[in-house]
């Protein structure tokens, strides 16, 4: 899908409205857990490329929108699992909800996030003393995200005309 959307992304990187759409979608999808006692943590893929800055941008926008119980980390880069655990420890949380910040919930979601082996996000949060719930679903399952992809695909097609 990246190649299809590349002409669009080359012109319109990190659109604030896209972030707002994603934030609205993920906060609505996890609203039942936002009880003040639960940290809601999203695990993105991450990359060493400059585009990794989207995770810090997402965290900043979540905070600016008042979602102080929401945290963003990555499997492959920064912020790391250790960074997220440190942030969560600053709060007085009893529970943690983990969800992938990925279009599809595949290997990283099932193993690195929700796996039962040492080193998984689930196990590391449990070791830190939290009751952990894993929501193994991709962002692509959320209707607002599907709509966003449709809009981007249409914009990419239109840019080729």
Features from the language model and the residues they span:
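Extended amphipathic ligand-handling, pore-lining, and cofactor/metal-binding catalytic surfaces
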Residues: 1-161
């Amino acid at each position: 899908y990246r190649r299809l959307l590349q002409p669009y992304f080359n012109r319109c990187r990190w659109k604030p409205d896209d972030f707002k759409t994603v934030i609205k979608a993920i906060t609505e999808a996890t609203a039942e857990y936002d009880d003040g006692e639960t940290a809601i943590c999203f695990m993105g893929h991450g990359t060493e490329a400059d585009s990794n800055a989207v995770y810090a941008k997402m965290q900043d926008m979540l905070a600016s929108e008042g979602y102080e119980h929401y945290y963003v980390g990555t499997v492959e880069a920064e912020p790391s699992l250790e960074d997220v655990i440190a942030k969560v420890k600053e709060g007085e949380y009893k529970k943690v909800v983990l969800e992938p910040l990925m279009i599809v919930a595949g290997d990283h979601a099932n193993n690195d996030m929700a796996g039962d082996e040492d080193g998984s996000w689930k196990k590391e949060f449990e070791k830190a003393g939290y009751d952990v719930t894993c929501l193994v679903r991709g962002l692509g399952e959320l209707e607002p995200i599907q709509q966003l992809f449709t809009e981007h695909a249409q914009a990419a097609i239109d840019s080729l005309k």
